[in-house]
Amino acid sequence: MSQAKRIKKDVDQEESQALNSLLDHLSKKYNISKDLILSSIPDAKKFDYDLKIYKINPQEIEDEIEAFKFNQTKDLITADEIFSIIKDIMANKNKEEKKLGNQTGKNKNISYQNAPAKKNNITINEKINVKYNTTVVYNEGGVEMEKQFNIMNPLLDVGNNFHLIEPYDLIPKDALIQKNGYQRYFSEIKDKFLRENEQYKDEKKPFDVFVLFLAFDVIDQKPTYDDLVGIDPLADFKKYILKINTNTDNIFLVSGQITYIEGNLVDNGKTIEVSKLKNIYEINEYSIPYKDVVQFYEKSSDPFAIYYMNGPYFSKDSKDFSVFNNVLKNVAIKNPHLFIINGPFFSTENEKVKWGELDTEEGMIDIIKKIKDEFIKTRTKILICPGISDNENFYPLPQPPFDKINNFFIGSKGNSEIIFISNPQIFPLNEAYIGIANFDVIKDIIVNSIHSSEINTVDKACEMILYQKNFYPVLPNTTVPKYENNQERVATVDLSQYNYLNFDRIETNPDIILTNSAMKTFAKKIHGTVFVNCGSFCKGNNYGEIAKITLHNPSKETKETDINKRVKVEFIKINQINNSKK
């Protein structure tokens, strides 16, 4: 009798629905047989019991598995590794419960505050023109879309002064204090917060007040609440130990999160007993009057159609662009208004690129020509955004547009159908703002966070972007490209340019944010912003999905103008497109 069958026989006849459901979920998700996962569990009865006691849900396990795969740079996971990850989750929860049992005193009822979203009315001029003094119209008889990009987010004009950052310690101080870098960014954020919140400057309060960014005093390890510290960049990066009670619902703290803190300074000024945490931005949701919105749709009754996809576009050990070319052809037939094509196009993780077997410069010229030829007779505007592993745009974030650094794009500059953008980027589309973050900020936030167990970490990661008004609110970033023998690494973010990742220049948060995460595909409404992740075009040797986003015209009957109530997101399997008639 196999080990799996012996274990099955030992388990009660009425095996719990929770265990069965979990095994079915993991088996289907990771393509491992249910029996094999069960065979890796030494004591299935105890495992079943612990699942109930610790209230472990499949999403929590899935998040940890994805983080493990990402950190280990693995595409697959074994049954033994799955069991080990679940065991670690149980151990951490047991540790937290013991810690809670020992905590007493004034720190018990800590207040973790995320202010409820406020909804206000705002005119179209207040939302767009006041900030950028530009016309943002696109319809069949309106202003051409490329005019919208003239004076947008300065990410378009950051120039070529980028450099890679050497391996770093917990707090890369030298990088943080450079011109226009994190120190200046932090100072502006703090001043703005205190200016707009006079009540927090009252020095007569019976507690101490701080504005700090959070960090974890460990590197390349899963942090715990014991590792939490607060850093003050404006006081020579002074570090405070933060004593925080974990008995709080909905808590989610990220390394790099700028936070207002109330508490008591103890231990000769080294430790803060935290009583209150608050994000430095509130999330404001806005409605634009119907009369301001309808002007964009008077000349066209068609819903606005957007397609977007993320590289890489061929497998790690291949150089075959035939599927990519076929998708271009099929999207061109659909004739959408906008097609967003994100890199990487020639990823440094591809073996043939890594060893110089491909001429990536000529390859990029061929790609641009192919895109131009396919869409030359359509109404479609093409946006091309680099990826952080692009061989022809190998800069840390924020990345400049391809045409800012590569002369070989001069020949296509006159083509009104193709527009090169930065990574990240915000641009206006009629009355909406769309943000593009072509990097795995969702996973990076989750990996660099501590949180209570009963939360949706993906939702909280999206929410953190909005509360920090920053496309990459993570510092230091531990998920960075690894090089030969995993000995050397460089930072994902150029910290001297960190202020360019902030989007507090716009009055509202973006209406739609497009991401590129290894997490499963999703479309989520988070406080009025629709987050869309379609994953990568090519995953290992398999093909993923692209996204179609439809923005419907405002209804004459309901006069509904909120973008998140008018948008529809569909994920289309690439194999389905490739197998259709060419």
Task: Kindly give the residue locations of the regions a language model identified.
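Extended recognition/assembly regions associated with phosphoester-bond processing machinery
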Residues: 2-582
